[in-house]
Amino acid sequence: MKKIRGLCLPVMLGAVLMSQHVHAVDNLTFRGKLIIPACTVSNTTVDWQDVEIQTLSQNGNHEKEFTVNMRCPYNLGTMKVTITATNTYNNAILVQNTSNTSSDGLLVYLYNSNAGNIGTAITLGTPFTPGKITGNNADKTISLHAKLGYKGNMQNLIAGPFSATATLVASYS
C-alpha cells in the first residue's frame, strides 16, 4: 500500500502540472504596421512675373531655380520624390486657358538640380532622387528648376495671368 501511495503522489503531481500546459491558450495578440511616413511638403510658388510671349521657345527657356521645404520625420536612406499633374503634355505641365486652341498652350518643364545647376528633365509620375538636398535631421530643402515653353502656335497664346499646379510627394526608402 505504501508503494501505491508513494507512486500516486508523483503521478498526480505530474497530471496537475501537465494539465496546466494543455489549458494554456495564446490570448494576447500584439500587432500593428510599420510604415515610413511621407514628408510634409510646404506649399511653393514659382513666380515668373511678366513674360513676353515672343521670348518663349517651344523647348523651354525662362529658367527658374526654386526650392521646396519639407519636414521628413523619417530621414534614413534615400529620398524619393514624385511630381504629378492633371494636365500634361510630353512630360510637361500644360497650363490651361493659355491658348485659343484647347489642346495647346503654355508648358512648364521641370528639371532636377545637379550641384546647383540645371540637371536632367523630371519624368512626371516617376520617382527620382533630388540632386540637391540640404538641411538637418527632419527639416529638408530640395532644389529644382523650371522652364517655360509652349505647345502649338505662338500666335494662339493668350496674354494674361497664368497658373498651374502640381503635386510633389517625398519620402525616404
Swiss-Prot record:
Could you list this entry's UniProt keywords, alphabetically sorted: Cell adhesion, Fimbrium, Secreted, Signal
Principal place where this protein is found?
A: secreted
The superkingdom of the source organism is Bacteria
What happens to this protein after translation, modification-wise?
A: Overexpression of this protein in the absence of chaperone PapD leads to proteolysis of itself and CpxP; degradation requires both cpxP and degP, as well as the N-terminus of PapE.
GO biological process annotation, one example = cell adhesion involved in single-species biofilm formation
- Record InterPro entries: Adhesion_dom_fimbrial, Adhesion_dom_fimbrial_sf, Adhesion_dom_sf, Bact_Fimbrial_Adh_Pro, P_pili_tip_fibrillum_PapE
**Signal sequence region:** 1-24
Q: Which GO terms describe its cellular component?
A: extracellular region; pilus
Q: Where in the cell is it found?
A: Secreted; Fimbrium
> Other remarks?
Strains of E.coli that cause infection of the human urinary tract produce pap-pili (P pili) which are hair-like appendages consisting of about 1000 helically arranged subunits of the protein PapA. These pili mediate binding to digalactoside-containing glycolipids present on the epithelial cells which line the urinary tract.
Q: What does the function comment of this entry state? A: Repeated PapE subunits make up the thin (2 nm in diameter) tip fibrillum of the P pilus. Subunits are arranged in a open helical conformation. Pili with a defective papE gene have low adhesive capacity or none; however, the binding property of the whole cell is not affected. Pili are polar filaments radiating from the surface of the bacterium to a length of 0.5-1.5 micrometers and numbering 100-300 per cell, and enable bacteria to colonize the epithelium of specific host organs.
Complex and partners = Probably interacts with chaperone PapD. Assembly of the P pilus requires periplasmic chaperone PapD, in absence of the chaperone overexpression of this subunit is toxic, with PapE accumulating in the periplasm. Misfolded protein interacts with CpxP, which probably targets it for degradation.
State the PANTHER family in the record: FIMBRIAL SUBUNIT, FIMBRIAL SUBUNIT ELFA-RELATED
Report the protein name in the record. Answer: Fimbrial protein PapE
Per the UniProt record, the source organism is Escherichia coli
